[in-house]
Swiss-Prot record:
Its EC number is 2.5.1.145. It comes from the Bacteria. One of its GO terms (biological process) is lipoprotein biosynthetic process. GO terms for cellular component: plasma membrane. It is a multi-pass membrane protein. The gene is lgt. The chain crosses the membrane at residues 15-35, 57-77, 106-126, 242-262, 289-309. Catalyzes the transfer of the diacylglyceryl group from phosphatidylglycerol to the sulfhydryl group of the N-terminal cysteine of a prolipoprotein, the first step in the formation of mature lipoproteins. InterPro entries: Lgt. PANTHER family: PHOSPHATIDYLGLYCEROL--PROLIPOPROTEIN DIACYLGLYCERYL TRANSFERASE, PROLIPOPROTEIN DIACYLGLYCERYL TRANSFERASE. PROSITE patterns: LGT. This is Phosphatidylglycerol--prolipoprotein diacylglyceryl transferase.
Amino acid sequence: MPNYINYPSWLHPEVIQGIPITWYSLSYILIILISYKFIWYQIQSDNVDIKKEDYEIFMFSLVLGAILGGRLASTLVYDKSGIYYSNPWLILLPFDQHWNFTGFRGMAIHGGFLGAIIAPLITINTNLKNTNVQKYFLKLTDYGSIAFSSGYILGRLANFANAELYGRVMKGGIIFPNAEPFDTNIPGVKEFASSVGLEISPHDLLINLPRIPSQLIEGFFEGPVTFLLLWFLFKKIKKYDGFIFGVYVMLYAFFRFFIEYLREPDKELGFIITYKPITSLSEFSFLNISMGQILSLTLMLSGLIWIIVTKKIADKKIKNNTNLAYKN
């Protein structure tokens, strides 16, 4: 009996085949809409005095920053073809170098985090200077982390629809059509294929093996699990503004770091730190570290620094208010 699952033949990157609207693009539109509505809902629920027009300017800068940061990280860090360095306009255009429409493909969330902070910071110190958006910026970062995590899984579902970002070989896994096939001469490949019910003829040089659906596992832990922790736990123990955002960044980085062990390293990058070269299908080392894990460790440290800094800001406000009350 076969011990694997075939990738659904009816699932394609396009919502409707022949029409250039992809699940990936649709997922981002839905995430933006969910975040927009959910942040505004929290603002109103907590009676935070922010004008709708100021909020919309803030959200525009946040979304723009997240997209720019995500695209820059994806194209300049993860892509090693050099095409984006020689044709930088392709970073922001939905076309390939031959001007064929491709849609926007590739976003790195680590860069998205950075852009989603830098762009609003610029905006609140220029267009929104001396507004309540500037006053409540740290509170808005908390709202944003809760809102974004609530819709995050949609992006990973789109990755699954693209049959990309799949995991490592596993019995009972899914055979992704776009997965890189294995050389049948690699030690352990023939034995593994036989163990899951895949036949290899003497003339087969390559074979596609079942893999962990790591994009779905990532989506579950970095999306719903993280959202529930933020909403039902950390929101209740929050003592100052900015705390939840810092916790969110650390939670995301924590889950991402460990789930990366299940994920196939990026083909062009491989392992950035290789303690033990992989020479057979069964070999594995916790000390082989991918780019995603390095960036996640950096992100985790950034989240911790954010929590420390925002705590100091909160303590300073309390001290100033106490001194002011004492003087009065």
